[in-house]
Amino acid sequence: MSYQSGTNKIFYKKNLSWTNNFVKSNIDKIERNYKKHPTRNRWNCNCHVIHDDDLDVEYINFDYLRKKYEKIVKNVTKKYNIEKYHLSDIWYNYYKKGQYQEVHTHAGNGGVTAVHYLLFNNKEHSHTHFIDKNIKSPKIKQGDILFFPCDLQHYVPENETTVPRLTTAFTITKH
């Protein structure tokens, strides 16, 4: 499903039916990792982030995610007219009350960013916000994966609820 913002088609969104099963299989590990490193990340933000190359934490099934995402990426790259690409590392972002993600972009040489909403309640959580006031975020529900150009500045506002918000993210780097 594509979304228009202004005159540009910049978003691609798809709901992934396997999301809830993945969360059930991995949430206990994510919670234990959070208890060890509640604000661990490689950026200037207040959230818990674990990358697929972090070796000092319990490993969630990033291999499963990579296989599933690779299947989707083949179609997404066609929609964005990307012929040669590389799928970056994959990481998860776990936000509890008071946690947020700062304004940022993703390196990707003109590629595409993906955010998969694994635990997301649209009555409790905020969607990904974009700095450009002309860009309206599409409506998101749990299980959605959202693709957008990697150079769009975006952020996640502070989680004001006690309900955790969990996403995974990666970048499709253009060659």
Predicted regions and their residues:
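Non-heme Fe(II)/2-oxoglutarate
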Residues: 1-83
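Glycine-rich loops and low-complexity Gly/Arg-rich segments
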Residues: 36-38, 116-118, 172-174
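Double-stranded beta-helix
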Residues: 129, 170-175
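Short loop segments at secondary-structure junctions
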Residues: 16, 119-123, 175
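Catalytic core of non-heme Fe(II) oxygenases with the double-stranded beta-helix
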Residues: 85-157, 163-167
